[in-house]
């Protein structure tokens, strides 16, 4: 009888916890770089590129806005600086979205005032604190989590002190490429960046990239 009561209590607790959880997704032009102080890897993101939040917690996500933008008759890839977004969790599902960027004017306007919108599926705008995550050095994205940890310890606008000492994603078993030493060689920055990101990718992505590169000859 005691076992049955304990099992029932546990089930009720799990049900209650689940009832207060929402799911966060994003518009197609947003990538999640970090979630609550940790690298946004497969351990944190679902196959649908979403993650759970809890209404009793403050959550923080680092996002990047990416768009293929027209420049006259040409097109190029625009990628924003990382944006730190902090907000209170909710039991509703949430969408983080950025405006559509189609041309140079849109890019300029976004650079002048980079921000995203956090909105529930019911249409309620969630209050946020946002700030660009400043990065330095060669391939600054490689040290994103360290930079974010320092940011969270700084007391800045969108910082969350409890995430300042978050365990690095490498310790969670992120990818083989990140566990080992990444070595880049090349005569220019572009070549070195290609080598770096190739080593960060999983095997399937590397194969697709190599097949794509062969077709560019």
Curated annotation (Swiss-Prot):
Please give one Pfam family short name: DUF2057
Family assignment from sequence similarity = Belongs to the UPF0319 family.
Matches recorded under NCBIfam families: PRK01904.1
Q: Which residue positions does the secretion signal occupy?
A: 1-21
Q: Which domain of life is it from?
A: Bacteria
Write out the entry's keywords from A to Z.
Signal
Name of the protein this chain belongs to: UPF0319 protein HS_1349
Work out whether the entry's keyword set contains Signal: yes
The record's listing under InterPro entries reads: UPF0319
Checking HAMAP family in the record gives:
UPF0319
């Amino acid at each position: 009888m005691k076992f049955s009561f304990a099992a029932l209590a546990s089930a009720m607790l799990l049900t209650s916890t689940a009832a207060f959880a929402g799911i966060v997704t994003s518009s197609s032009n947003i990538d999640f770089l970090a979630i609550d102080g940790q690298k946004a890897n497969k351990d944190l993101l679902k196959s649908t590129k979403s993650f759970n939040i809890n209404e009793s917690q403050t959550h923080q996500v680092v996002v990047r806005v990416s768009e293929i933008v027209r420049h006259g008759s040409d097109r190029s890839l625009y990628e924003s600086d990382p944006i730190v977004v902090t907000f209170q969790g909710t039991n509703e599902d949430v969408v983080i979205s950025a405006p559509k960027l189609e041309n140079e004017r849109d890019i300029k306007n976004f650079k002048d005032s980079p921000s995203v919108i956090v909105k529930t599926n019911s249409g309620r705008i969630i209050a946020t604190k946002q700030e660009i995550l400043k990065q330095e050095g060669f391939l600054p994205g490689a040290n994103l989590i360290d930079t974010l940890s320092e940011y969270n310890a700084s007391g800045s606008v969108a910082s969350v002190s409890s995430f300042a000492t978050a365990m690095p994603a490498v310790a969670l078993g992120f990818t083989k490429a990140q566990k080992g030493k990444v070595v880049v060689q090349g005569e220019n920055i572009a070549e070195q960046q290609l080598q770096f990101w190739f080593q960060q990718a999983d095997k399937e992505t590397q194969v697709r990239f190599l097949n794509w590169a062969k077709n560019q000859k």
